Amino acid sequence: MESLNKFKLLMAEIGEVLKATSVVQFENGYWVIEYGESELVWIYYHVEDDSFTLSAEAGNIQEQDQLELFKFFLHFNALGQEQRTVKTALSGKGDSCMLLGDHSATSLSTLDFSGIFFSFAEQLIHWRYLLKSWPTATSEDKQKMQENISFMNPHLVRA
């Protein structure tokens, strides 16, 4: 529980560092950070391995695009599997895409957390653009969007 208490202290300080609208703890291990214009990032702290997960809704996937995007998600997730970097996941509804980032909390400082958070928020912007633009994009445009995300530096989101 000592590691959870350290993480709670970090979360108590992080709002000011991030210039967040609010940081709210809902129960042991669960927080939400609100920033910008009602942007929400959820945080879950894993006591068993002293790590945390960031999650945010990236957008919706139209039914006709699901197969094509699912293949891309599998490829993207496989690249980040060993590095514990941002990966995509789909909600139970089948059309809502969540962006997740798993990170170690061991020896985590507020500066480390803010870097992880801002990198996550940056990738969220890219994913939202991809999902919004996908239905009307040409094959060439889709390829460029995939390359832009595939070439993101995975070390930017490592703890």
Question: Where in the sequence are the language-model features?
Answer:
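Structural motif
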Residues: 27, 46-48, 93
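Charge-rich, low-complexity N-terminal segments
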Residues: 1-42
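A short acidic-to-branched-hydrophobic micro-motif
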Residues: 42-45, 50-62
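Short, Φ-rich (hydrophobic/aromatic) sequence segments
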Residues: 10, 14, 66-75, 117-120
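Hydrophobic residues embedded in beta-strands of well-ordered beta-sheets
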Residues: 31, 50-52, 95-97
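Well-ordered alpha/beta subsegment
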Residues: 85, 90-118, 122-139
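Short, internal acidic amphipathic alpha-helical interface segments
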Residues: 58-96, 100
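Short, highly charged C-terminal tails/helix-capping segments
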Residues: 132-159
